[in-house]
From Swiss-Prot:
Ca(2+) 2 binds at residues 372, 374, 376, 378, 383. GO terms for biological process: abscisic acid-activated signaling pathway. The gene is CPK12. Residues 323-358, 359-394, 395-430, 434-464 form the EF-hand domain. Residues 22-280 form the Protein kinase domain. Ubiquitously expressed. Belongs to the protein kinase superfamily. Ser/Thr protein kinase family. CDPK subfamily. Its EC number is 2.7.11.1. This is Calcium-dependent protein kinase 12. InterPro entries: CDPK_Ser/Thr_kinases (IPR050205), EF-hand-dom_pair (IPR011992), EF_Hand_1_Ca_BS (IPR018247), EF_hand_dom (IPR002048), Kinase-like_dom_sf (IPR011009), Prot_kinase_dom (IPR000719), Protein_kinase_ATP_BS (IPR017441), Ser/Thr_kinase_AS (IPR008271). The active site is at 146 (proton acceptor). It comes from Arabidopsis thaliana (Mouse-ear cress). It catalyses: L-seryl-[protein] + ATP = O-phospho-L-seryl-[protein] + ADP + H(+); L-threonyl-[protein] + ATP = O-phospho-L-threonyl-[protein] + ADP + H(+).
Amino acid sequence: MANKPRTRWVLPYKTKNVEDNYFLGQVLGQGQFGTTFLCTHKQTGQKLACKSIPKRKLLCQEDYDDVLREIQIMHHLSEYPNVVRIESAYEDTKNVHLVMELCEGGELFDRIVKRGHYSEREAAKLIKTIVGVVEACHSLGVVHRDLKPENFLFSSSDEDASLKSTDFGLSVFCTPGEAFSELVGSAYYVAPEVLHKHYGPECDVWSAGVILYILLCGFPPFWAESEIGIFRKILQGKLEFEINPWPSISESAKDLIKKMLESNPKKRLTAHQVLCHPWIVDDKVAPDKPLDCAVVSRLKKFSAMNKLKKMALRVIAERLSEEEIGGLKELFKMIDTDKSGTITFEELKDSMRRVGSELMESEIQELLRAADVDESGTIDYGEFLAATIHLNKLEREENLVAAFSFFDKDASGYITIEELQQAWKEFGINDSNLDEMIKDIDQDNDGQIDYGEFVAMMRKGNGTGGGIGRRTMRNSLNFGTTLPDESMNV
């Protein structure tokens, strides 16, 4: 009878079974070498992620060593806030389990796909985090070797969630001057010296430069119909800055990209030098462009509306989907620089100045006053949405019906002055001119507003107008259609 194969172990010590301490739940993700589960600590109820690696996929001692090194590197970097924190590791006869911090916001890659590309200020913030991770790795003697948007997770679904690095499966410890020859990484992000099989930590800066390029335009700098074609483009090192949106992107941003995607690793910026580059350091050099003339135009149109129409727009804004208001939510956060939840006069003025608006302070003050329906002195999120949603939302009948029904409290088919007084009270608004407003809308002079009169009021004076920049937010980076379906590993 043949002897059973001896069980091999990754960890140098015996552990409990992972299920002694945790309940394993739903599958969160499936990778080439393992499956990630939601797990819950049995005593504390804390929710974490558990990456389980089947030992049957570890074919030789080198594979076992690689898993151990991944665990060691995660512990080594665990104090850095933008690295996914490992809690503990477990091993049984069939699997190795890495229990780590749960990041519920999804991959950076998915957000790029959803948004198309980022503003310069947002891209600068993200790349500062990414290169900060690179600097932390290098300062601690680690080369990541597989930096890509798929390996960065957001801590939550909030737009301002922390970005954290994960998946150190290809990472290695290194000493100063040490060179590697193993061909690893992912095709779009691999540095030329990796293709030449003689490289060091500089390869991570190249990969981060590719990510920055994608953040700003939505597509990678080097791509072709085949993996070999991609490698050929990488070795040629020619960057494309002629097509949109590059003509409108600052020279400082392009300067940084050129220095990160320098083909000679000895001339390439270090991670620390990237973090000291003016585009990263100076907000004025890496400008956000949160507003354009269309926003000013919409605020002006909003200022000319009566309060019923303003309130109806707010009701409509509150029922729109996240997809529809996603761009405006971003815009609000960009303007609300102190994250107070309201936009002050100074914040509105600063935002307009950043995009070269020449409105006088008195005009900006008037726009704020018009949007500030509850007269609090600032614009809250609901007021901002109401003032800036595209007026084509008024072409959708279901939106108008919903808004009318909000004011028609008794569902009589008419809005009365008493119902308006009740609505005004709900919104915290004082207005003694309701009689005059009803007269302006009430075409048959019966003292109340029917649905037809309400629709006429809502659609009166609405131009088609331009976009607020949401077109770019909805562009899709889809490597399966726009680009070759080749986001494979090298």
